[in-house]
Amino acid sequence: MSLPVLSRIRPAVAALSCLVLLTGSVYAQALENLSIATQGGQRQTFRVEVARNDADRAQGLMFRRSMPADQGMLFDFGRVEPVSMWMQNTYLPLDMLFIRADGTIARIAANTEPLSTRTIPSGEPVLSVLELNAGTAAKLGIKPGDRVEHPLFKR
């Protein structure tokens, strides 16, 4: 490869490297502790990303190919209201836990279909939604009525 070709490629490689680094940082949000106290007396702890603004809520877990079993995403809607979720551009099957302002789980949409544009309603007004890997709620015995513990529910 001649020197003029190398001099043209080098800036492109540098730009591509920066893009990869910036894209990776989108997923490097700080993780927060969240626990679920089941009615059976068990406590399950997760590390969650919290989506607090419109941009983060719109992005959600889109385009991700994996998520550790002990992690999830908590969507903070900022007020109690009926919400609907969907799985557009989301490759991971998920359990969606719809959570009331007092931290109790109102509804669980289990094993949602990846890439679906079908809406998944909360069924009642909620403050937030917790997304976990599909099957997690059933495996850990998490059910409606269980209590989610996180600073969001201590407002």
PLM feature segments, named:
Residues S2-A15:
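Bacterial N-terminal signal peptides that target proteins for export
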Residues A28-R155:
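Compact, glycine-rich, soluble single-domain proteins
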Residues A12-G24:
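Bacterial N-terminal signal peptides
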Residues M1-V5, S25-A28:
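Extended hydrophobic/aromatic-rich secondary-structure runs
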